[in-house]
Amino acid sequence: APLFVEYEDVLLRRAAAAKTPDQNEQLLVQVKDTVEVSHAAELQDYFQDDCVTTVASHRGVGTLAPGTAVVYPISFPDRLELLLETANGLKQVRVPVAGEKLTKEIRSFRRLIQDSQSQNYLSSAQTLHGWLVAPLQQDLQGAGIHTLVMVADGSLRTIPMGALHDGRHFLVDSLAVAVTPSLALTDLSAAQRRKGSLLSVGLTESVEGLSAPRYAESEVQAIRTLYGGKLLMNKQFSAPSLEEEIKDQGVGIVHVASRTVVGTEAGDASVMAHDGEQT
């Protein structure tokens, strides 16, 4: 929302001009909290459900696990601001790239990476890496970061961050990469995963004229090798069987390897099961 963006702009400019580290830290905390509130408001509007935010909990700066960093990319018409949070606190990094130029590059990257027969996406992948990751590289290495969480906004949510490229390696080759719309709505406590609490479902057959994802089978097998769990593939993957497994078997995580559609409203989202499109 424009009001949130304007407020974030004011806070970031004040933080950059702060005379003491304490003033800078306080202002950056306000920026982080404002971003979280704006993203939570977007999710409320998308799901048409005020209860979406009830899982949020207050989390102070410096409470991240060692080795974990969170990046809030905030795009403005005249620049990109990267708000980096580690166990050591918050840091602001300004990148001189206009919002329109960033959005154009993101769209180009998304379009090119969908062509599995070409590597033309690498140029865009390197450009985006130069804007989103490279300015933070020294801080990430100095803090011994192994897990990078991107609290993405807008078009940044549409691209695979792990596929950003530094000219030699993909980002996912050096860091575990996660993307979330809001960290305040994410449970950061260690999950107590039991062997078998994972349910993997997917399609390797064409359904209703739509081809199955090319690597669905190898993807599911790789996940099961790591975490075990139950598998429902092709005819076994139907709406009733999925509902039964989730309700009766105490499934904690569901991994889906199928065609999906995410619309502008929650009611427009769907996933393809063997018995057809499910909303």
Question: What does each model-identified segment do?
Answer:
Residues 19-26, 120, 211:
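A structural signal for alpha-helical segments
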Residues 1-7, 15-23, 42-58:
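Acidic, Ser/Thr-rich low-complexity linear motifs
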Residues 115-118:
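Helix-loop-helix
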Residues 56-110, 120-279:
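Catalytic cores of enzymes
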